[in-house]
Amino acid sequence: MAEVEKTVRTLTGRVVSDKMDKTITVLIERRVKHPIYGKYVKRSTKLHAHDESNQCKIGDKVSIRETRPQSKTKSWALVEVVERAVEV
């Protein structure tokens, strides 16, 4: 049998919390068309992702990928920091 390569899901979002050790909370926003009215509405999802080196800060734009479950709520891992947050 030939090996079937599994596609890895990758998402981009903003870090909204970095208070946990080696874990970040990422807010993913998407636009969905309303089934009846046709208007595009913003929908959002919060995901917990593994950040091995604690390099992310609140406001950073990050890329995450799906992995095996790390804990009860964490099954995503940090791929890269796309854009650093502006410090004021």
Swiss-Prot record:
The keyword Nucleotide-binding does not apply. It holds the Pfam family Ribosomal_S17. GO terms for cellular component: cytosolic small ribosomal subunit. Keywords: Ribonucleoprotein, Ribosomal protein, RNA-binding, rRNA-binding. The keyword Lyase does not apply. One of its GO terms (molecular function) is rRNA binding. Disulfide bonds: none annotated. One of its GO terms (biological process) is translation. One of the primary rRNA binding proteins, it binds specifically to the 5'-end of 16S ribosomal RNA. Part of the 30S ribosomal subunit. This is Small ribosomal subunit protein uS17.
